[in-house]
From Swiss-Prot:
Database matches in SUPFAM superfamilies: Rof/RNase P subunit-like (SSF101744)
Gene3D superfamilies: Ribonuclease P/MRP, subunit p29
Compartment(s) where it occurs, according to its Swiss-Prot or TrEMBL record: Cytoplasm
Catalytic activity: Endonucleolytic cleavage of RNA, removing 5'-extranucleotides from tRNA precursor
Name recorded for this polypeptide: Ribonuclease P protein component 1
Subunit structure: Consists of a catalytic RNA component and at least 4-5 protein subunits.
EC nos: 3.1.26.5
Species assigned in the record: Methanosarcina mazei (strain ATCC BAA-159 / DSM 3647 / Goe1 / Go1 / JCM 11833 / OCM 88) (Methanosarcina frisia)
Amino acid sequence: MRSKVEILPSTLIFHELIGLEIKVSNSTNPSLIGIRGRVINETKNMLVVENSESRELKIPKADSEFVFRIPAELSEKGRRSDIFVKIQGNLLLSQPENRIKNIKKLRKWG
């Protein structure tokens, strides 16, 4: 049985984002503010979010701010409530697979 990977607020930017719920809390493009949904894909510069109407929306990471919901079952052991984490999109600007590799380096050396 595979062990569950914990997602902590301090390491969220290194984790897989697909499947997490998200809200755009700020953006240089005012029409993006308030968009909510689930991340269904990610590229170096974009998050693809499926909203409640099953529409796929492409949101640039640069110049946007996101609030991610980390479900209690994926967060710290013993936590009973979800965690909401605000992240500047510029911190996510890299290919997802490279960003995920960086957490392995942190764990190895940290």
